[in-house]
């Protein structure tokens, strides 16, 4: 069955990347498609790998035999996790020809490729740990498979940008930001950009540890004859405490200092002059990025440039009081009129369509702008954005 799982995983991933997303016409030498599809392939296939881990039916007395051996429940849980995780890592290693293909067709950032595979490895570990927990709670094979998919789907959904855009229309921005911090997709994407921050490692570490610990408690109680006692007295208290540690530990980890920037251009490492400008920024400085993110005909190079701009603004906001938001000025909307009224250029394309990619900086009634963030000035991106902010600082 291991070979069948690996074949299904690789076939599903290959189909998504090369047929669904049409990799060869994407004009982009990155692992973005791999990072985009691996959560959804894992959503279905990782629970399939874990669903029979704790079954003990009439035809399969594996667990009964295991319990009769002088092996502690923690060792059993860790053994099953390590065995399954090694299989997942081996399967991930079989995707390396895709990275070789990307390197042959273009010049990918090696640091970003390494970070992307690290992100995939951590994602698979978290998915497998959660799937093992679901299988331990349900035990019946089909039920364990469905429970694993349901648990992973809820976690993936919180980090899905499409769901986020829908949620932002009915709930405040902070609600989506809070929910997305508990999704593995959020941290997969962040690591895949080429930066390793403590919070992403804390998320995956806490998620795997919490899932395996609860799995151990469930297996231990089943070994003693019943699961109901897990939700009584001190056992319930420790379960609640573990949930609180997971819920509070992830957002608190944002305060941990340091990061490892693996990108070749050190996109996440701000220059000393930039840091000085950010320190002088007055309270309430607001940056609004106008970007036509839903445009289907926009070249991949422009989309990649826009993602880099968003990463730069996010990095700046974490190191200062700067606030920023993204506005998508779709045609014939109020957002498009707002962008044009603020001096953001509408850039035409050969297809006849157009797009916006500019920003405004506001503070105390004063307004600075970059009408178009030209990709030809990509190497001066940080300088251009800082100059727009520094203009407000000088005026103050």
Predicted regions and their residues:
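Membrane-interface helix starts
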Residues: 1-8
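Long, hydrophobic alpha-helical segments
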Residues: 34-56
